[in-house]
Each structure stands twice: as C-alpha cells, then as structure tokens.
Amino acid sequence: MPAEHAYVPSMPPVTTMTADELLRVQIPDKHVELVRGVLVVREPAGLRHGRVAMELARRLGNQVDAHRLGRVYAAETGFTLAREPDTVRAPDIAFLRRERVPDPEPAGFPNLAPDLVVEVLSSNDRPGEVLTKVADWLSAGTSLVWVIDPERHLGRVYRDDGSEQIVAADQSLDGEDVVPGFSCQLEAIL
C-alpha cells in the first residue's frame, strides 16, 4: 500500500505589526485597528452611525466640560490595550477621567484603557467581533462600555464587574460613578 502524502501549500508567514508601526499606516478613507498584532481594516461608518456617535459625544462632552471631569475623545483615537502582540483599539467615543489624562498627551497611542468606551454599531459589525472588542476593553481596565445599536433602538451596558444591562429607547444611559451626573435618554440620540 502506498503511503499517503498530504500536500501543504506554501503560505507566507504571518507577520505581526506593532503599535508604533500602526502609527505610520495610511489607508485613506478606512478605519484601522491592530488586534493582537494583526492589522484590521474596515470601511468607514455610514451617516446614521456618524450622527448617533456625534450626538452622544456632544452631550457627554458638555457634561464632562461643565464639571471638569476629564476628556472626551472622538473616533479614530487609538488606545494601546496590550503589548506583544500589540492591540490598539479605536472606539467611537472614549472618556478619560481628569486624573488619568496623560500630561503631556502623547503623540501616539497611550498605553491605557479609557474609563468609558462607546461603540455605535454599523450594519457591517458582526456580533462576535463586537463582543471581542468589549472583552478587550474590559480586560484592559475600562470600567464601562456602552454598545449602541441604532437599528434595534437599544443599547447594551457592560461593566467591569461583569454585569450587563439592556437599555431600551425610552430608558437612559447613565454615567454611573464613571461620568457622575451624566444621563441621556437613548431615543434622544437615535
């Protein structure tokens, strides 16, 4: 009986990228992140996504500025969550408490997780990928993650203590002890 031989095609080795290398990547009109050393390229978000994210960022920013709570960062702001291999995530909205804002702010990606992260879902987001992002944020030290689903008119709240909550359109997102005094009815931003 002849011996069986499997054919294994020659594949290029997988190369990983670092956060510093990601800073030099320029792909026009694309959203890029680094996930465990692998470059992830996504299409830009649509109009509804942009409006929802901007409206929530505006309201959050007003509260943060009025009470000098810290800083709110817009989409495309990368945060280094892990090293070797590097993970750099860029949420739609991020908040850092005043005492955690780096001074001076680095030109690159800070090695810290925001206190609050907001992800606004787009039609091309896959549930498994979103949950992986949430897990990355929480394991890196984020206290509160809001995932806003404009299509379903609901939000999901994930906390660092492992608790979760669904927020219906007629209910409010609450900043809890992360953004004291902030509350926003979900339907007001949808």
Please give the residue ranges for each predicted region:
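Gly/Pro/Ser/Thr-rich low-complexity, intrinsically disordered segments predominantly at protein N-termini
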Residues: 1-190
